Amino acid sequence: MEITTIIFLIISSLTFSIFLKLIFFFSTHKLPPGPPRFPVIGNIIWLKKNNFSDFQGVLRDLASRHGPIITLHVGSKPSIWVTDRSLAHQALVQNGAVFSDRSLALPTTKVITSNQHDIHSSVYGSLWRTLRRNLTSEILQPSRVKAHAPSRKWSLEILVDLFETEQREKGHISDALDHLRHAMFYLLALMCFGEKLRKEEIREIEEAQYQMLISYTKFSVLNIFPSVTKFLLRRKWKEFLELRKSQESVILRYVNARSKETTGDVLCYVDTLLNLEIPTEEKEGGKKRKLSDSEIVSLCSEFLNAATDPTATSMQWIMAIMVKYPEIQRKVYEEMKTVFAGEEEEREEIREEDLGKLSYLKAVILECLRRHPPGHYLSYHKVTHDTVLGGFLIPRQGTINFMVGEMGRDPKIWEDPLTFKPERFLENGEACDFDMTGTREIKMMPFGAGRRMCPGYALSLLHLEYYVANLVWKFEWKCVEGEEVDLSEKQQFITMVMKNPFKANIYPRRK
């Protein structure tokens, strides 16, 4: 009887202390400030009144009034936005394990990601670690990246041909982004499936990927009360599932073809996925299983999308800068001429091993990523448990995001931030040791930061340097007479592209 009483008292004391701790936690820490909200619908009415189409401008205005961390309510759940780089570092780097989770996916996203079985959407845990480790250790390690150098040269030849053809047929370049995306897709399809695909095959995969991409908005209504829409909107659900089935059919054709090959010159992403085993439960040493066909499709789709669009968009911005500011283009070219003095006429390509000598080129690319990051927000993060950031409550049931575009334009860290000035990334004419990972300090984060940082950021930087260097080495880029390069931005899916694509004439620099 005495032992039972003691155990009861201990349990009661612990329960009471936890209760008091929770009461104290929630009474001393409140959500970050934000605009007025209504029950159930949150801030939607307020956002519509304040030009929701310019969401970044709305957030910037709210931050100027409420401070560097604000709360919006879309429905009943809080969505927290951070504009301050120090708070971003505190969350993503110093407390990365807490701020690295993902929310449960919406019904349509669950279909597209095979129930969150890709790197981007998977919750923070053993599955996410397994998928990310497979990509970084098998495909993105330096020796494997180097093995694909011939692939990059091949896609560069495709890109050059696209530009030369348009210049010859139209008299100028106006579809730069389409050409850049197309050439990058050739490269990424080769890295993914291990095969140089024909033009019609590439177009088929591109179309399947594009249709799934636009489905996020086209079928978003299916995520509203899904138990109801599955009954009332059966035809729309059927259309959406047929779209996914079509994508799976296209991609699995190349996955299955690769699985039948006994040898391959270079390891491709599909090779690693066919051999990968993923955990069936969170605990270490638990049971494992092979990926399903649908999961392989989701991972291949993620690989193609994540490595194509942001890189192509950044290249568009960089080449627009070259056209708008001829002096910057001249400096990039003169640097290459100096480095390769005496061999200009014989050298047809700037090789990857030469890129480390091109400090000014690297500075131009970093400045463009600062001024025009391909995405102005990260994907939504979620905390693993209720926590505090900047003195405010960050609840587990909400989401938190970080305004990448604003951090790269912070006048407290960047002098004259709206001016394009590559020299800020140079020290005595040499490229400075800039920490892109934000480990020591976040000054800008075009690839994110912390545990969820883009695993392919180094590959993306290599692609930007290699393709831009060769486009400037092969051609002089000039603005079309009577045209101006407009650097206004607009959101397109997840990337920030040029509102008005630039037009240019290209002139071969050597015969």
UniProtKB/Swiss-Prot annotation:
GO BP term (any one): chlorophyll catabolic process
Record GO terms (molecular function): fluorescent chlorophyll catabolite monooxygenase (deformylase) activity; heme binding; iron ion binding; NADPH-hemoprotein reductase activity; oxidoreductase activity, acting on paired donors, with incorporation or reduction of molecular oxygen, NAD(P)H as one donor, and incorporation of one atom of oxygen
Major site of localization recorded for this protein: endoplasmic reticulum
Pathway the protein acts in: Porphyrin-containing compound metabolism; chlorophyll degradation
GO cellular component, as recorded: cytosol; endoplasmic reticulum membrane
Gene designation per UniProt: CYP89A9
EC number in record: 1.14.14.-
Organism lineage: Eukaryota, Viridiplantae, Streptophyta, Embryophyta, Tracheophyta
Keyword Nuclease: no
Pfam families: p450
Subcellular location: Endoplasmic reticulum membrane
Name used for this protein in its record: Cytochrome P450 89A9
Coiled coil (UniProt feature): none
Role: Involved in the chlorophyll breakdown by its action in nonpolar primary fluorescent chlorophyll catabolite (pFCC) decarbonylation. Involved in the formation of major chlorophyll breakdown products, including non-fluorescent dioxobilin-type chlorophyll catabolites (NDCCs), during leaf senescence.
